Design a protein with these regions (language model features):
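Cytoplasmic-side transmembrane-helix entry/capping segments in multi-pass membrane proteins
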Residues: 55-61, 86-90, 111-121, 146, ...
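The first (N-terminal) embedded transmembrane alpha-helix
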Residues: 29-42, 60-63
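C-terminal ends of transmembrane helices
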Residues: 40-50, 73, 98-111, 156-166
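Helix-coil boundary and interhelical linker segments in multi-pass alpha-helical membrane proteins
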Residues: 18-25, 76-82, 129-142
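Conserved small/polar residues in nucleotide/adenosyl-binding loops
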Residues: 10, 185-187
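Small-residue-rich segments of transmembrane alpha-helices in multi-pass membrane proteins
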Residues: 61-67, 118-131, 149, 174-184
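Structural signature of hydrophobic alpha-helical transmembrane segments
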Residues: 25-36, 81-94, 139-151
Length: 187
């Protein structure tokens, strides 16, 4: 049994030992929390288009930015859901909702940032989900599934709550294929 270093601490793993450079770990952490904020803004923007009140903004932002990780952590069933044990995730999701509530995002630049930001965040979160599954000793296919669920689960929950068909089921957004690819790369 090896040790995986994750977020500055050692975590048991089945077959290997990974040491993470502090700079890489910092960049990864910054990217992760930036993704939570961005997905909170995207969710809040979608709530604005539907005319939701502030409670709707908060819920849609939370589903968008935290739902996939929550699904992953519940399915892995090893400890507290990360978004609940690390409050900065909730703060960033709610901050994204507030930003979207008071700042109007629209136009081609926003559409571009939203589509490409979603794809980049999805890839990052796929890697996060796959690595977390590996950390807990899950087999290959469940590791890939946890990567995909982490990357796409939040947008699926958001879309279902909003009464829409989940965009990952044919909206031509590049999220599932990069999620599978990055999950495979990190296994």
């Amino acid at each position: 049994m090896g040790v995986l270093i994750a977020q500055g601490r050692a975590v048991k793993s089945n077959n290997y030992m990974v040491e993470v450079d502090p700079l890489i770990e910092s960049l990864y952490r910054w990217s992760d929390i930036s993704g939570v904020l961005l997905m909170g803004i995207i969710g809040g923007t979608m709530a604005r288009k539907r005319g939701y009140d502030i409670i709707g903004f908060f819920f849609i932002a939370m589903f968008s930015s935290l739902g996939g990780g929550m699904v992953r952590d519940v399915l892995i069933n090893r400890g507290t859901v990360a978004a609940m044990s690390q409050p900065e995730y909730l703060y960033l999701a709610f901050t994204g909702a507030l930003i979207a509530r008071f700042v109007y995002f629209k136009g081609k630049t926003w559409d571009y940032l939203q589509a490409h930001g979603d794809a980049v965040v999805s890839g990052l979160w796929a890697a996060t989900g796959a690595v977390k599954a590996i950390t807990y000793g899950l087999p290959l296919i469940p590791c890939i599934m946890m990567g995909v669920f982490t990357a796409t689960g939040g947008s699926m929950i958001r879309d279902i709550v909003m009464g829409r068909e989940p965009s990952v089921f044919g909206d031509n957004q590049p999220t599932v294929i990069p999620a599978v690819a990055l999950s495979l790369i990190h296994i």
